[in-house]
Regions:
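Conserved loop-to-helix junction within protein kinase catalytic domains, corresponding to the end
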Residues: 36-37
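Short, conserved charged micro-motifs
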Residues: 16-17, 100-106
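Hydrophobic ligand-binding cavity/cleft-lining segments
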Residues: 12-23
Length: 141
């Protein structure tokens, strides 16, 4: 039996980064259930400090997720952590767009707030390493 996988990215602004990556990938931010969140606060299972408002909606402060229109792709969860990123990622995402679209996509992502870090190639393969707005590295290939 296959096991599902969720990708979790530590960050300082989970809702902002979820919005950014949803735009990058053409995915959607997973909606949060405001009524459920209010009920959890009302019953004492959570506190107001566990919540925040993002784009006019009550959401959990600790995280936000994005999902693909393709249900077979993994969910990506952006999780609030207190410390900033300090070293190179041990795991990173590769955004595959193909050689014919790579330069346009890099330009689009830089326009959305990514930072170009370097370009590389190995044999016939070429990619551009970028950083998202919080400094997490990813590649466009």
């Amino acid at each position: 039996m296959a096991t599902d996988v969720q990708i979790v990215i530590d960050c300082a602004d989970p809702h902002g980064l979820a919005d950014w990556w949803a735009e990058v990938l053409g995915w959607q931010v997973e909606p949060q259930d405001e009524a459920f969140i209010r009920r959890m606060v009302t019953t004492g299972a959570a506190t107001e400090a566990d919540t925040t408002t993002h784009r006019g909606a009550l959401v959990w402060r600790s995280g936000a997720a994005i999902t693909s229109p393709d249900p077979h792709r993994p969910r990506v969860l952006f999780q609030l952590v207190p410390e900033a990123k300090t070293v190179k990622n041990r795991v990173h995402l590769d955004v595959h767009v193909g050689a014919d679209r790579r330069e346009d996509e890099v330009g689009r992502l830089v326009g959305l707030g990514a930072t170009e870090l370097h370009r590389a190639s190995q044999g016939p393969f070429e990619w551009v390493t970028l950083a998202d707005p919080e400094g997490n590295e990813f590649c466009v290939a």
